[in-house]
From Swiss-Prot:
InterPro entries: CRISPR_associated_Cas2, Virulence_VapD/CRISPR_Cas2. HAMAP family: Cas2. The gene is cas2. The keyword Nuclease applies. It comes from the Bacteria. It comes from Thermotoga maritima (strain ATCC 43589 / DSM 3109 / JCM 10099 / NBRC 100826 / MSB8). One of its GO terms (biological process) is defense response to virus. Its cofactor is Mg(2+). This is CRISPR-associated endoribonuclease Cas2. Coiled coil: none annotated.
Amino acid sequence: MYVIMVYDVNEKRVAKILKIARKYLKWVQNSVLEGELSPGKYEKLKLEVSRLIDEKEDSVRFYVMDSQKVFNLETLGVEKGEDGFIF
């Protein structure tokens, strides 16, 4: 499955959320990560993130698709993210 994770969390937790997410996904833009995950790894990621966030003030969204091939990606402006991640 292909997962896009988008988060908006309290400043105190940003670094911790990013550290957890980068164990599973590639950073592509501020507060956005994406990549292929097995269902088991996806569940582990959600569990780790849910233990860290404050559900009263933080928001984390997961967009889950069967494959990266089911959508088109267009970037305007600067490409951000980790080197070596190619679409």
